[in-house]
């Protein structure tokens, strides 16, 4: 079959007429120096602060220092293959993370990429990791309780939805355990939890994930992890990624709890980045804006007004102290930003008081207005009782001939300390907390030997579940204390069946 010359010329003409050349314009620069996870790039004159840039090997970077002749970029990934002279491309995007319900039950890194081996996260929604905190008129005062399930916290240092409560203490004093128990207690509370692990060991994070999975809490939890082996920029970004994921739910009218474990490691990572970027160091070699680092993060926790949907985001930041020194730089910064702190003391922890909450140095500045009425009534005198017990305890060591009132205070104090102890991963429903604290503050435990208190508590709960379920349900539903005679009758009825061990 022969093709005629005219046909060929017609085909060529058609091809030429249909040819379209699309011009792709990229703003590119050149790496002039690279090392320690930082690249200096020349030629990105129009780059925005916090913009994502892409290196020629596909690794992303974050523009941090915008200087006269170059841009300081922190590299968000392996930097060994990046060389001087490599091309760097602007993306035109500010750093953002994927958000949405699809993330629930997943373990992701601060870039929103899954690290749990369960396939990709199928969400198309994203949010910028840096966004302004809700304004004054968009907020509402904290008035709903966030039940942690931990007696010593719910009674003495209550937390409300939308509050920021610092958990501070030395290493190995049970900070993470408090967070895990709080997350476990949010089951059936219509609460979404986000656990941000910053600079933790991979094995520790795995342990936390398995604990949450075992108790069925992973279904409403997102775990964001930047482990100790990750580059410093990822440790710095992790909390912002976590709060961005939480804000998506908050602005949709839901309630969110975000745990930052812990912000000391984020501050250390930020110090490392700042020094490598040649920013001037300040106190303890931290950069001048280390306060702003944490304040802009924690200000994003809020209880939104009804006009904005009434959602809330509660923050539980952790700070690790050295030898109990809460007056160091980062601890004082975060104490001044948050609405109260829970101080965990290693002396108490090692003497068997767990959770090791020090009620004298712990405070909740707004949670009191969120406490349910029943708890307010039974826990009103607890803090004073404990304080006077600690004071008298010191004197009691020197003298044996104590008057009856002092002896009674010491007895009540010892029983209070015992009641506030709690086992790991066993959060208590608020109605049961009210029941045991009622028994304590109304004197029903004064004649129960201290070593029997724990058994008394367990058996009391079993007795109430079987015989007085209506009392517990009434506290849970109304938030009010049932009539005194009903409570007294129930506890006296149980005491008649309780046999002390000696």
From Swiss-Prot:
Give the protein family: Belongs to the ATPase alpha/beta chains family.
* Assembly notes: F-type ATPases have 2 components, CF(1) - the catalytic core - and CF(0) - the membrane proton channel. CF(1) has five subunits: alpha(3), beta(3), gamma(1), delta(1), epsilon(1). CF(0) has three main subunits: a(1), b(2) and c(9-12). The alpha and beta chains form an alternating ring which encloses part of the gamma chain. CF(1) is attached to CF(0) by a central stalk formed by the gamma and epsilon chains, while a peripheral stalk is formed by the delta and b chains.
- Respond yes or no to whether keyword Cell membrane is given for this record: yes
Compartments where located = Cell membrane
The function of this protein is: Produces ATP from ADP in the presence of a proton gradient across the membrane. The alpha chain is a regulatory subunit.
Instruction: Tell me which HAMAP family the record gives.
Output: ATP_synth_alpha_bact
Region (Disordered) spans which residues?
117-139
SUPFAM superfamilies tied to this protein: C-terminal domain of alpha and beta subunits of F1 ATP synthase, N-terminal domain of alpha and beta subunits of F1 ATP synthase, P-loop containing nucleoside triphosphate hydrolases
InterPro entries, per the entry? ATP_synth_asu-like_sf (IPR023366), ATP_synth_asu_C (IPR000793), ATP_synth_asu_C_sf (IPR038376), ATP_synth_F1_a_nt-bd_dom (IPR033732), ATP_synth_F1_asu (IPR005294), ATPase_a/bsu_AS (IPR020003), ATPase_F1/V1/A1_a/bsu_N (IPR004100), ATPase_F1/V1/A1_a/bsu_N_sf (IPR036121)
What the entry lists under PANTHER family is as follows: ATP SYNTHASE SUBUNIT ALPHA, MITOCHONDRIAL (PTHR48082:SF2)
The answer, when asked if Membrane is one of the entry's keywords, is yes
Annotated membrane topology is: Peripheral membrane protein
* Sites annotated Required for activity: 362
Query: What are the GO MF terms of this UniProt record?
Result: ADP binding; ATP binding; proton-transporting ATP synthase activity, rotational mechanism
Q: What is its EC number?
A: 7.1.2.2
Keywords of the record, alphabetical order, are: ATP synthesis, ATP-binding, Cell membrane, CF(1), Hydrogen ion transport, Ion transport, Membrane, Nucleotide-binding, Translocase, Transport
**Alphabetical list of Gene3D superfamilies matching this protein:** 2.40.30.20, ATP synthase alpha/beta chain, C-terminal domain (1.20.150.20), P-loop containing nucleotide triphosphate hydrolases (3.40.50.300)
Its organism's taxonomic lineage begins at: Bacteria, Bacillati, Bacillota, Bacilli, Bacillales
The UniProt record gives the binding positions of ATP as 169-176
Catalyses: ATP + H2O + 4 H(+)(in) = ADP + phosphate + 5 H(+)(out)
Gene, per the UniProt record: atpA
Q: What is this protein called?
A: ATP synthase subunit alpha
């Amino acid at each position: 079959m022969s093709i005629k010359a005219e046909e060929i010329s017609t085909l060529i003409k058609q091809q030429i007429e249909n040819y379209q050349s699309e011009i792709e314009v990229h703003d590119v620069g050149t790496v002039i120096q690279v090392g320690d996870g930082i690249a200096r790039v020349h030629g990105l004159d129009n780059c925005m602060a916090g913009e994502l840039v892409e290196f020629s090997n596909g690794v992303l970077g974050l523009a941090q220092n915008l200087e006269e002749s170059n841009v300081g970029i922190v590299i968000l990934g392996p930097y060994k293959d990046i060389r001087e002279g490599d091309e760097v491309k602007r993306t035109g995007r500010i750093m953002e993370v994927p958000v949405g319900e699809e993330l629930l039950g997943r373990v992701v890194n601060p870039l929103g990429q899954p690290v749990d081996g369960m396939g990709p996260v199928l969400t198309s929604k994203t949010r910028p990791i840096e966004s302004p905190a809700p304004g004054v008129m968009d907020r509402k005062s904290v008035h709903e309780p966030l039940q942690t399930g931990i007696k010593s916290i719910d009674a003495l240092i209550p937390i409300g939805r939308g509050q920021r409560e610092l958990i501070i203490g030395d290493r190995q004093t049970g900070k993470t355990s408090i967070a895990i128990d709080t997350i476990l207690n949010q089951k059936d509370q219509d609460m979404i939890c986000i656990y941000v692990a910053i600079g933790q060991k991979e094995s520790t994070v795995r342990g936390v994930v398995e604990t949450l999975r075992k108790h069925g809490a992973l279904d409403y939890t997102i775990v964001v992890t930047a482990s100790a082996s990750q580059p410093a920029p990822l440790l710095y970004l992790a909390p912002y990624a976590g709060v961005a994921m939480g804000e998506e739910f908050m602005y949709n009218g839901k309630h969110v709890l975000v745990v930052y474990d812990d912000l000391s490691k984020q501050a250390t990572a930020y110090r490392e980045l700042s020094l490598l970027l040649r920013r001037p160091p300040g106190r303890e070699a931290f950069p001048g804006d280390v306060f702003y680092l944490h304040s802009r993060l924690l200000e994003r926790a809020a209880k939104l007004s009804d006009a904005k949907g009434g959602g809330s985001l509660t923050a539980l930041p952790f700070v690790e102290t050295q030898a109990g020194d809460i007056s160091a730089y980062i601890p004082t910064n975060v104490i001044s930003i948050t609405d109260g702190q829970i101080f965990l003391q290693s002396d108490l922890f090692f003497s068997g008081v767990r959770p090791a909450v020090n009620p004298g140095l712990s405070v909740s500045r707004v949670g009191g207005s969120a406490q349910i009425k029943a708890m307010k009534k039974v826990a009103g005198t607890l803090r004073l009782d404990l304080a006077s017990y600690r004071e008298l305890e010191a004197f009691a060591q020197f003298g044996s001939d104590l008057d009856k009132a002092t002896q009674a205070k010491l007895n009540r104090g010892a029983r209070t300390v015992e009641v506030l102890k709690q086992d790991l991963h066993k959060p208590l429903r608020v109605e049961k907390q009210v029941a045991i604290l009622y028994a304590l503050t109304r004197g029903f435990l004064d004649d129960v030997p201290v070593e029997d208190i724990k058994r008394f508590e367990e058996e009391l709960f079993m007795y109430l579940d079987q015989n007085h379920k209506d009392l517990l349900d009434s506290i849970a539903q109304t938030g009010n204390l049932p009539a005194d005679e009903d409570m007294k009758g129930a506890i006296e009825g149980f005491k008649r069946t309780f046999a002390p061990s000696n």
